[in-house]
Swiss-Prot record:
SUPFAM superfamilies: Lysozyme-like. This is Probable transglycosylase SceD. Coiled coil: none annotated. Is able to cleave peptidoglycan and affects clumping and separation of bacterial cells. GO terms for cellular component: extracellular region. Keywords: Glycosidase, Hydrolase, Secreted, Signal. The lineage of its organism: Bacteria, Bacillati, Bacillota, Bacilli, Bacillales. It is found in: Secreted. Belongs to the transglycosylase family. SceD subfamily. CDD domains: RPF (cd13925).
Amino acid sequence: MKKTLLASSLAVGLGIVAGNAGHEAHASEADLNKASLAQMAQSNDQTLNQKPIEAGAYNYTFDYEGFTYHFESDGTHFAWNYHATGANGANMSAQAPATNNVEPSAVQANQVQSQEVEAPQNAQTQQPQASTSNNSQVTATPTESKASEGSSVNVNAHLKQIAQRESGGNIHAVNPTSGAAGKYQFLQSTWDSVAPAKYKGVSPANAPESVQDAAAVKLYNTGGAGHWVTA
């Protein structure tokens, strides 16, 4: 799910897609249209999620009107994000095969948030979306299951990463803007579709960690990470 609150201020999304390898560029050498890029980032312009801002490798960071913007590409994958200048917003990255289409990531205000876009190996039918945000880098694919701390439910490595970037592992986290809640930042409608009868209609943040873990595993098994990211 999207948009977990971790600190004050604003940080927003990134888009990652496969591109073409090229030269390495640096912000100090670039003649960037900062105003245009800032406006595109603030409005979550889909162009930023569909293609890099230029061919080849580049790594640009600049401040503009109270926000810090970052655009990067290794020539194959590209990413972008922004946050209020001085806020502790982390740069995000992910990998997506060239054959996949990546839809724009969501944009949310209020507190330090950032967002990533991941694409599964094979195209899947879009499942109910959950809001997402995080301050950690995620590139791994789930490889093993292991019981999470404070719970006897086996949670795979990918779900643990999702929980970490959604809420920092806080089972009581609540996003007052989107209403997403709990360790995995479930929206209420999504939670009610996978929660035990006893907890339907109850905020995910009020459910025990083991119940939240079990619901997340159930949701993940029906559609993978697509429940938490737009991919």
